[in-house]
């Protein structure tokens, strides 16, 4: 299968009903890329909802709009991620009264033995499984960071003065998805504390689930912005 050079891609676009010509639009196609640009922006939401473009001007305007939208959201998204991480971290440290990851597991993460009194056996088992999954995820993240010589983690493993990685260092390598899962595994009291620190309306959040559901909702948008994926749809 042969690849197409820019001129051939322009002919292919014209054959597909997209008007494109001249050095200006050729440069725009080169800069935005055929696969990232045209192929990435010709649909809205999914491949079954094709946008009715007839000229490359329309395609390029859509790409520019999407880029401007990402630029507008980037700073705000980074602020939200950083603020929520630090507020959650402070709450965990205070409620665990320790910076130890093991103490975090024992004191502020829900499991079989600290499940609500009203929990059924099955609910207790689910909480314990979630806790085990969390521990496995955190260990995998630490192992990967160590393998990649991340100084935020290797400092603690390679220094005889430390016995383990503290919670605050763990937070430095957590993705937004990791953060959301950790928040979902915390005890009700700690989720309640974090929610109030964030001034969330807890009166409409009986189970204190909004804190991690918001993070899950924002996660995909954050990743799309960071990796220059399409966000306008």
Q: PLM ranges: what are they?
A:
Residues 1-233:
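Amphipathic alpha-helical interface elements
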